[in-house]
A protein has these predicted regions:
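N-terminal secretory signal peptides that target proteins for export/translocation
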Residues: 1-2
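Cyclophilin-like peptidyl-prolyl cis-trans isomerases
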Residues: 5-8, 19-153
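Bacterial Sec-type N-terminal signal peptides, specifically the leucine/valine-rich hydrophobic h-region
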Residues: 14-17
Length: 153
């Protein structure tokens, strides 16, 4: 499993972030933050797994990418682990508590069609997406990487 995970992470060169975090108690970002555009490379050092390198597209999900790049630059993710692994489906990380209940200080709007945002991205193998609770706008810092096509998400 660990080797397969490393191979998946190495092969993941172009990753897309679509909106979605399992954070339930957090403050909504109230200030107007300038959103990014274009592609960005991010690097996250995951405890016990190594470094993830990903390219994310701010033109498709500007709020999500702006948040992810900010957290990555702040080294928020470094040293965290994957707290949820479902073999053949996905791996989830980005929780400072390590149990699926934590996140960063702010939540962001989910950038996906069910939330009124035109977004052509699909959860295909290697896609990086934000985890969220039932609230469409609850994404924070938790993310997941799909291990196989999961276009029903």
């Amino acid at each position: 499993m660990k080797k397969m995970l490393k191979v998946l992470l190495v092969l993941m060169t172009v990753v897309s972030i679509a909106g979605c975090s399992s954070k339930t108690t957090t403050e909504k970002a109230t200030k107007k933050t300038k959103t990014l555009s274009g592609n960005y490379q991010v690097e996250i050092k995951v405890k016990d797994y190594g470094t993830i390198y990903a390219e994310i597209d701010a033109d498709t999900a500007p709020i999500t990418v702006t948040n992810f790049v900010k957290l990555s630059k702040e080294k928020f993710y470094d040293g965290l682990t994957f707290h949820r692994i479902i073999d053949g489906f996905m791996i989830q990380g980005g929780d400072p508590k390590g149990d699926g209940t934590g996140g960063s200080k702010e939540t962001i709007k989910g950038e996906f069609s069910d939330n009124g945002v035109k977004n052509p991205l699909s959860h295909t193998r290697g896609a990086l997406s934000m985890a969220r609770s039932q609230d469409n706008d609850s994404a924070s810092s938790q993310f997941f990487i799909v291990q196989s096509d999961s276009t029903y998400l």
